[in-house]
Amino acid sequence: MAIKGLEQAVENLSRISRTAVPGAAAMAINRVASSAISQSASQVAHETKVRRKLVKERARLKRATVKNPQARIKVNRGDLPVIKLGNARIVLSRRRRRKKGQRSALKGGGSVLVVGNRRIPGAFIQQLKNGRWHVMQRVAGKNRYPIDVVKIPMAVPLTTAFKQNIERIRRERLPKELGYALQHQLRMVIKR
């Protein structure tokens, strides 16, 4: 870390207060961790075309403290059920007219289920035994349970985004944030 006078500031603060330097370190670590979460959430939301709020609430931050200067980010990497994207509605498609006696490729006379901003052909809404409503779709090749919940795969984009962003942000922002936090702690100690 190449910050001018950092060692001197740390030494002075350590002489004045025992908790000032660890408090500054914890503050800087927490800021870096929360910015890593928000940047990763934005990147995943852009890639998967899911609202940023839905992605961000899958990450939990256990904040660093004076006694334990480690922040822990826990991410739920499970697939996102489509029903969470927003209101589900059936849109009638009048473009594909069929002749009398022919079966439609899309069941229900050419209607398509739209959830949020996604069109899901051949899907329907059903209440499961656990009481939750989900968007279901028939799955070819599954003999025993031929219907399945429609989900958006999130494991790969979340993993790659968090691994990239955490390392990059730690390199770029931690020294700056540590400097700001030390200055803040110094101001707090001087005010007392």
What do these predicted regions represent?
Residues 1-192:
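Short, Lys/Arg-rich flexible segments
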